[in-house]
A protein has these predicted regions:
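Conserved Ser/Thr-centered positions that define the repeating blades of beta-propeller domains
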Residues: 40-41, 80-81, 120-121
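Loop/turn residues immediately N-terminal
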Residues: 34-37, 75-78, 115-118
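Entry beta-strands of beta-propeller and related beta-repeat scaffolds
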Residues: 21-29, 68-71, 107-111
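Surface loop/turn motifs at the tips and blade-to-blade linkers of beta-strand repeat domains
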Residues: 51-55, 91-94
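Enriched but not universal
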Residues: 2-5, 10-23
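An edge-strand/N-cap motif at the start of beta-rich repeat modules
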Residues: 20-52, 131
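Repeated scaffold domains used in trafficking and secretory/extracellular systems
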Residues: 18-20, 56-64, 96-105
Length: 131
């Protein structure tokens, strides 16, 4: 059974498949059931928990962005400068709706939310609706 599907550009993200990225020599993913951050140094053969606190909410999407790792969570946009070991809030206002996924648009960040497409030219600190 398929769950919700969100579209970011041409990439489809199904909630039944965990979000996974390469960051340096590690694979980092969102655990498919727990919605926490895990990492692998064995090309995905085994996984270890990297961040399991609930203070950020449930993780939904990950995006490497410059020297940061950005995350969409159930509480908003969070960022990490430690490969996901710790997280700080970047944007938690509900004015954009619920964030679903992020995409690096070059000069701006793009975000699909429950209220439509938004963009940010401030690394996700503020958002404007794309018209």
């Amino acid at each position: 059974m398929r769950k919700k599907m969100y579209l970011c550009g041409i990439i489809s993200i199904y909630s039944i498949m965990p979000q996974m990225i390469m960051l340096g020599s590690e694979m980092i993913r969102i655990h498919p059931a727990k919605k926490t951050i895990e990492y692998s140094t064995s090309q995905g053969r085994s996984w270890s928990t990297r961040y399991s606190s609930t203070s950020c909410g449930e993780f939904i999407d990950l995006l490497p962005y410059g020297n940061e790792l950005l995350a969409v969570t159930s509480k908003g946009i969070y960022y990490s400068t430690s490969q996901g070991r710790s997280w700080s809030s970047r944007y938690t206002s509900s004015s954009c709706g619920e964030f679903q996924c992020l995409m690096d648009g070059g000069r701006e960040l793009l975000a699909q939310t429950s209220n439509g497409l938004y963009y940010s030219t401030s690394s996700g600190r503020s958002w404007s609706k794309r018209r």
